[in-house]
Amino acid sequence: MAIKDVKFGNDARVKMLKGVNILADAVKVTLGPKGRNVVLDKAYGAPTITKDGVSVAREIELEDKFENMGAQMVKEVASKANDVAGDGTTTATVLAQSIVSEGLRAVAAGMNPMDLKRGIDKAVAAVVEELKAISKPCETSKEIEQVGTISANSDETVGKLIAQAMEKVGKEGVITVEDGTGLDDALDVVEGMQFDRGYLSPYFINKPEAGTVELDNPYIILVDKKISNIREILPVLEAVAKAGKPLLIIAEDVEGEALATLVVNTMRGIVKVAAVKAPGFGDRRKAMLQDIAILTAGTVISEEIGMELEKATLEELGQAKRVVITKDNTTIIDGIGDEAQIKARVVQIRQQIEDSTSDYDKEKLQERVAKLAGGVAVIKVGAATEVAMKEKKDRVDDALHATRAAVEEGIVPGGGVALVRAANKVSATLTGDNEEQNVGIKLALRAMEAPLRQIVENSGEDASVVARDVKDGSGNFGYNATTEEYGDMLEMGILDPTKVTRSALQFAASIAGLMITTECMITDLPKEDKLDAQAAMGGMGGMGGMM
């Protein structure tokens, strides 16, 4: 078993705090509209330049094992805030540093750590409730744009792009961020349902200049099995040919004789047909086929429920205004499905999202909601160099998460004002069960000024003066670090998503509480120290032998 190094009490806490400060000091320089960049060296390629707090935190590993434990615990705060709200990582880190340093000072003065922690927890719970009370819904496109702009470090073009994307695909739509090819940002919107399966044979192509298959007002047959025998599909083909409409076949697979016959019929112009594989695998494929069925008012032909492909009729086929198939994707535009049924299906999938514990499953279910409810928007980030593109892509990603959080739980005044206001209101009435809990409450409420102070410091102004002026104000009154003016934060468009502020505070207080109540730290001895320890033990054994 490895030899361990153990530290107790104040020795352990001092080391831990040093690690916390190193990580937090590196992260907090990025906070606010005048926050600075951090350059991260990479093992290969150009360095990365970022203003994203969690990207900075993830890079930090310290040589001293005890200091590193402190740093890693604060890194967890940033990661958690990023996972839940997608933004607010720097705010969470600043709050954690402030609560930990104030808390450890109180512990060093002889206070009981457990009572301090209980006081901190009470203060945080009360402030979270107050944040919910002052939160207002984020509904207009202008508010969405403002949230996106603030989160992208005051880049208005990013805020506008995200607001446009949400307007086009709806608040439930999928918005993805990709590398662009030019200098300017671009927004591509895919309307209708798109899935990543292309045509099964290039002979189906009827628009050779674009290399695509386009079907106008087609029938759509959905089959939950492989089709290899043409006799199974023949009755449907004949019925569709009589109706004079094209046909799209979506099945687990179409192969052999069946595919060859479809290709021959298409090339001879007897019937206009195209075949694609069904999206997904296993149970997810069944669910997605059902989604397409509801969107196009069709029925999934499945042997599991006693249906036979040979007996399928035109009534069981779905329909859409248009279908476009490329080598890699199929897009169904304007399915004729019933609006009420589509909404009911969306509600059902949303319930599955709430019940799911897997991030991957949640993401896939969210994609299904978007395909049914709105569409897919792709923001293509443009920049002059790859380094600049990476930095901008990080900011767009943060802004996108922030706007989603704002739509979900509403918005509060930004610039650290919401926490100051909530803490002020709570301080008048909140008391603990004993004096040490009261100290915990006070230090937590004092720590909630830290994000405002850091934003002001990063803009080169006097943090104490600004913090006092903001505390003396009321409502949305705060400090705009961009223009260096005081005013109404909501009117100036400085907004934070409630979810981001709430998550940052809760995660920071949770980890800080654990660190304040730490009395002992254990780590492996570094290799050189291990060798010295083993040599010393060996030397003592030799001396015993001589005697």
Swiss-Prot record:
Domain of life: Bacteria
Keyword vocabulary terms for this entry: ATP-binding, Chaperone, Cytoplasm, Isomerase, Nucleotide-binding
GO-annotated cellular components: cytoplasm
Catalysis performed (reactions): ATP + H2O + a folded polypeptide = ADP + phosphate + an unfolded polypeptide
Keyword DNA repair in record: no
Record's protein name: Chaperonin GroEL
InterPro entries membership: Chaperonin_Cpn60_CS, Cpn60/GroEL, Cpn60/GroEL/TCP-1, GroEL-like_apical_dom_sf, GROEL-like_equatorial_sf, TCP-1-like_intermed_sf
Subunit structure: Forms a cylinder of 14 subunits composed of two heptameric rings stacked back-to-back. Interacts with the co-chaperonin GroES.
Functional description taken from the UniProt entry: Together with its co-chaperonin GroES, plays an essential role in assisting protein folding. The GroEL-GroES system forms a nano-cage that allows encapsulation of the non-native substrate proteins and provides a physical environment optimized to promote and accelerate protein folding.
Localisation: Cytoplasm
Top EC class for this record: isomerase
Listed Pfam families: Cpn60_TCP1
Residue positions binding ATP: 30-33, 51, 87-91, 415, 496
EC number: 5.6.1.7
Molecular-function GO term, any one: unfolded protein binding
